[in-house]
Curated annotation (Swiss-Prot):
Record keywords: ATP-binding, Cytoplasm, DNA-binding, Isomerase, Nucleotide-binding, Topoisomerase
Oligomeric and partner information: Heterotetramer, composed of two GyrA and two GyrB chains. In the heterotetramer, GyrA contains the active site tyrosine that forms a transient covalent intermediate with DNA, while GyrB binds cofactors and catalyzes ATP hydrolysis.
One annotated Gene Ontology cellular component of this protein: chromosome
Domain (Topo IIA-type catalytic): residue spans on this chain: 97-562
Entry-linked Gene3D superfamilies: 3.30.1360.40, DNA gyrase/topoisomerase IV, subunit A, C-terminal, Topoisomerase II, domain 5, Topoisomerase, domain 3
Taxonomic placement: Bacteria, Bacillati, Mycoplasmatota, Mycoplasmoidales, Metamycoplasmataceae
GO biological process: DNA topological change; DNA-templated DNA replication
Species for this entry: Metamycoplasma arthritidis (strain 158L3-1) (Mycoplasma arthritidis)
PROSITE patterns: TOPO_IIA
HAMAP family noted in UniProt: GyrA
Name the UniProt record assigns to this protein: DNA gyrase subunit A
UniProt EC number: 5.6.2.2
Amino acid sequence: MSDDKKDEEKLKKSDENFDDDSKYYEFDDTIKKVFEEEKAKEEDEDEEEIPQEKEGYQVKSQLLETEQNGLQPADLAKVMKSSFIEYAMSVIVSRALPDARDGLKPVHRRILYGMSELGMFHTAPHKKSARIVGDVLGKYHPHGDSSVYEAMVRMAQDFSLRYPLIDGHGNFGSIDGDEAAAMRYTEARMSKIAGVMVDGIKKNTVDFIDNYDGTEKEPTVLPSRFPNLLVSGTSGIAVGMATNIPPHNLGEIIDAVCALAKNPEITIDGLMEFVLAPDFPTGATIFNKAGLIEAYKTGRGSITMRAKANIQELANGKSKIIITEIPYEVKKTEIMEKIADHLKNKRIEGISDFRDESNRDGIRVVIDVKKNAVPEVILNTLYKLTRLQTNFSFNMIALVNGEPKLLNLKECLQVYLDHQIDVTRRRLQFDLEKDLARAHILEGLKICVENIDRVIEIIKKSKTDVDAQAKLCQTFSLSEIQAKAIVDMRLGRLTGLAIEKMNDELDQVNARIAEYRAILSSHEKLIELIIKELQEVKEAYGDKRRSEIRWDVMSSINNEDLIPQKEIVITLSSNNYIKRIDLEEYREQRRGGVGVSTVKTYQDDDIQDVVVANTHADLLIFTDEAKIYRVRGHEIPSGTKQSKGTPIVNIVPTIQKNEKVVKIICVTDYEESQSLITVTERGVIKKTNLKEYELIRKNGKYALSLLEDDHLIDVRVVDQDEEIFIAASNSRINRFNVADVREMGRVARGVGGIRLSDDDKVVSVSSSKDGAYIFSLGAKGYGKLSLVESYRKTKRNAKGVITLNEDKAGKLVYAAAVHGVEDLIIMTQSGIAIRISLRDINVIGRNAKGVKIINLKGRSDQIVGVAKIYDEDATDRELTKEEYIEVTKEIDIDLANE
């Protein structure tokens, strides 16, 4: 056996022997008992550490049924209930809710009273905020210093209070959400208007109570010579309730209090003639009158606050949104961060840059809008997605007689008015008693002066002051106070001038006493005094409203509501580039003018279609594959005369690459009496009720079924009693009744409208409602204006009659019925546009060759599009005598030939 194995055997044997305590050790009974108890205790502790199932736990408790060692039995549920109620009432009464009389919470009241006791009025120098906070903490407010300083900071912020009660010196925070500097760095004093809050507090106008340790006295309420609850507003969260009262304009609230004082029966509607709406320190715009009326009548309601912004148009076609005022209690940095987040997440598009240019003069947030974006839409989106527009919810709860109460507007004003009646009466009573005491002394001094020799004799013979006072009282029937005043009087008061002043003072004091008694004995005079004093406060501190009231604004508006209705020109290129230009940018030119460039042409891209529309109208976009899409006029990006435009796929993402837009029509109203006429290149016509196209969306639908070798070429909205004119490239126009075409479903194929040869195609469609004349224009710039009656009526699917000499005018590019007074915009392939008036074109016969309408730039240039500027009030022009002779002669010849 190896040495290692021997060692293992010895170790094993020793362990076995060690486990058998009785074999090697002998304990006496006492020691053994101690070890057994310790071992049992350790086993119990080990068992407690072992986790057990819930069922294994047994909670042992001992109920205390009688008083033991100073402990009294109590029901836990009752103790919890009473303790919570005490805590809740403490929060409600002593911390979170304001008193309806002065509009202050205890901490604000203690700050103002403490500062007034320190003499820190607006005329005194500023003192360290830490000194003020320490004084308030030590004497009145046994809570944390942060709560006192935060309340003090808020009262100094001109963006938190409409009329700040603290005049702060140093960093007291900002509207960006920056915190105030530590109280060891800032200084403060009472603002001028805060002095009005404590005015008269030394005249027993309010009740005082002991402070928390009984060493000081503090007021239960401040005199408050203006209605601070509504003027400054307040907010706070108590237990089971909260308050939220907005600030108001001082002048409006004082006028309402005066109106209530004059007419206690005035209604809330009557009071709202004075109190127009809240007036926030940050300005902004207020709307939602229904919510305001509800708030003033019930104490609960909501209004909407919206930032003030204006749109600035720039010379390069871009624009800026400039925000100058933001809603109440909204941090400017929060708005900036939200805008940045939405731009990053692409919830807001069309903004190229934004920045904060705010300074001491006020808020200025500048948002740069991209060239093709609509600033009104972007601004509305910002209102929806950021706190540039937010609601203020009224919850006008305040303490009335120490109990929380929901107040309406009249009740708020009534509580304050009752408080002022009490304060004013107590002040007058105090002044009356003070003047009575002064008059009493002056009357004693007057008796002294009238009997000066006798008084001096009595005083000289008296051994002490007390003896002199007693003899004076006995001799002249004076009171102790009068006698003491005589004894204490200096000899200088006996001069003639001093005696005269004393008599004048007595007269003045007696006059004031009479006035005080008259006011105190008459409720009407007391009310007049209160109104007078309130008006003095208004004149001293009143100012204009900061928040604008707009009851005509909806709280939730569509983007389109922000876009002005304007007449626009929509241009479409052959490569599906589209843009809109204000109609006003096209100036009228005389016939034969060269025109102005309206689009920068690119290789293989020419102007195809021109539509005069409205920003609030529907644009039905038809493609050659007979698909139809719908967009609004303002959704087409704005461009300049020289800009290329925007690919239409950016506006209608579902449009296919192989689709080519062939027609855009403007629809303002989907009337059931109207029909939509579609005409294909091969002369197929279809009539469908216009209502079937009302629900078309951007994803598109089919307008009709096409043959394989056919494409949609033109679309027209018509009434049932109209005549239709289909013009073909072979210079023929087919005139027939709309009623000849039966109404079909949206996806039907249609019937023949005009008979064509293989090389010909339809170029345009018009109707008799458009006027009594037909204007025809060829690709070479020649055209003419003729009477509709010059074109004989045929039938559907006929060849039609000739309108232009093709050799001279070229292929027909446009032929439509007109009144003869409209303006036309003519587009050339080279991108030139000219605006002409049909008034400048003489009416000639159908068989005439035509006149030069536009001078083209080079032989390769030709006319590709014509748009008529519609005038709803337009009527057919009257023929001149010469025109009448010519056209009627031709009509007679045509009739004779038939």
